[in-house]
């Protein structure tokens, strides 16, 4: 596809410490391939994403939640340097909430959807999202919020085992090098172990959620863009084929599939909360009662957005860019059956599935037939993939060393995919 006007620059923003954030790379490639000048603001030096040939420039800026003024100054400097309003695209929770909280100041230099800060925070918080679903009558898994270990055990009697244990604020776990923010506890011992890993002293950070049986393909994703009037200009659905970490994590292999019911319940929910901008939602189909239950809402771009590409090449980032620069967003039809892969994550996930006896190496290779796009590898932009491989090896070696030291010290460890 082609855009009539690509003169407005785009700034991709990440605020959390995640060096292998493939969503940012997807945005860079999606817009720059059409001729849009794209810049990246993040806090990682020499990250794999920096190596993309499509980037016009990289600004290293560290976000401190305790002192956001410094980050705001850094973004203002970027805006002044560009010399004209740029489309601002946050790709993580911290960045999205920062933009919502400081919208008035940022509008001097940037273009972005007008999403109320209260709405963004309500959707990003697992606690407030559950309460919101309950108030609106939107089906969701039963969720409980224990205040201590004893209450966690007591409440698990109410939900039954297995139970899904989640961190209310996964970002707190980055500081403790705990990658897995979601665990399926199948016994009281596993529940207590998960509690010890996820809880934060003096700040309850754990919830218990009803376990809904089903594989990855029972999770339905919605990826969409809503304009300033709340109209959904683009909205696609799809399912997870594999997750990393397995059974609880983000998509490592997904397929675009139309589901009119998920489309309808999602657009009704988004209208009820007054949503604007790019959104990424997850629903799980509960075969026990036939209902789709809302698992989470990302009030921002989802990392798997390039799974959802229309027959005319449209995706939510391109729809956002067109709309914010005053260009029409064409009607688009999803490419049903399109498959998308996060290469390192799916490889790691396949090893776990293999140990569980549900996926052989040959079956894994066969499952990759038909994949149209990888999150990292691109024939026209191969260097980020090579840099990612090197960074992944370095990170794995460091994690192995920390795990060994933790075992010697008797501390709990965890592993996962980012």
Show the residue positions of the predicted features.
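Phosphate-binding site of ATP-dependent enzymes
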Residues: 186-246, 257-267, 284-293
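Flexible, glycine/charged-enriched surface loops at secondary-structure junctions
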Residues: 207, 276-280, 330-335
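Glycine-rich phosphate/pyrophosphate-binding beta-alpha loops
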Residues: 241-253, 298-312
């Amino acid at each position: 596809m082609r855009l009539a006007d690509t003169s407005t620059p785009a700034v991709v923003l990440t605020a959390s410490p995640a060096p292998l954030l493939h969503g940012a790379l997807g945005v860079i490639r999606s817009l720059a391939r059409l001729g849009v000048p794209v810049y990246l603001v993040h806090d990682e030096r020499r990250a794999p994403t920096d190596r993309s040939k499509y980037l016009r420039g990289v600004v290293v800026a560290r976000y401190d939640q305790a002192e956001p003024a410094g980050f705001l100054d850094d973004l203002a400097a970027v805006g002044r340097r560009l010399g004209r309003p740029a489309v601002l695209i946050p790709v993580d929770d911290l960045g999205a909430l920062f933009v919502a909280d400081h919208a008035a100041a940022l509008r001097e230099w940037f273009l972005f959807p007008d999403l109320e800060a209260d709405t963004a925070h309500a959707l990003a918080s697992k606690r407030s999202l559950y309460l919101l679903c309950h108030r609106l009558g939107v089906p969701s898994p039963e969720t409980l919020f224990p205040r201590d270990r004893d209450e966690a055990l007591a409440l698990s009697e109410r939900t039954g085992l297995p139970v899904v244990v989640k961190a209310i604020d996964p970002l707190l776990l980055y500081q403790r090098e705990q990658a897995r923010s979601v665990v399926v506890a199948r016994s009281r011992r596993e529940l207590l172990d998960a509690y010890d890993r996820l809880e934060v002293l003096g700040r309850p950070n754990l919830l218990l959620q009803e376990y809904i049986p089903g594989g990855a393909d029972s999770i339905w994703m919605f990826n969409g863009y809503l304009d300033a009037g709340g109209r959904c200009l683009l909205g696609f659905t799809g399912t997870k084929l594999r997750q990393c970490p397995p059974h609880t994590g983000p998509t490592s292999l997904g397929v675009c599939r139309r589901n009119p019911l998920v489309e309808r319940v999602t657009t009704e929910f988004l209208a009820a909360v007054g949503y604007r901008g790019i959104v990424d939602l997850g629903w799980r189909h509960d075969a026990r009662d036939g209902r789709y239950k809302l698992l989470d809402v990302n009030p921002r771009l989802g990392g798997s957005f390039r799974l959802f590409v229309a027959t005319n090449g449209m995706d939510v980032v391109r729809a956002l860019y067109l709309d914010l620069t005053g260009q029409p967003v064409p009607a688009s039809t999803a490419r049903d059956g399109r498959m998308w892969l996060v290469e390192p994550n799916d490889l790691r996930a396949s090893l776990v599935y293999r140990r569980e006896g549900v996926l052989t190496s040959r079956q894994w290779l066969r499952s990759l037939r038909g994949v149209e796009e990888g999150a990292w590898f691109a024939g026209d932009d191969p260097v980020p993939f090579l840099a990612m491989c090197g960074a992944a090896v370095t990170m794995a070696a460091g994690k192995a060393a920390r795990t060994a030291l933790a075992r010697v010290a008797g501390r709990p460890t965890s592993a996962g995919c980012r």
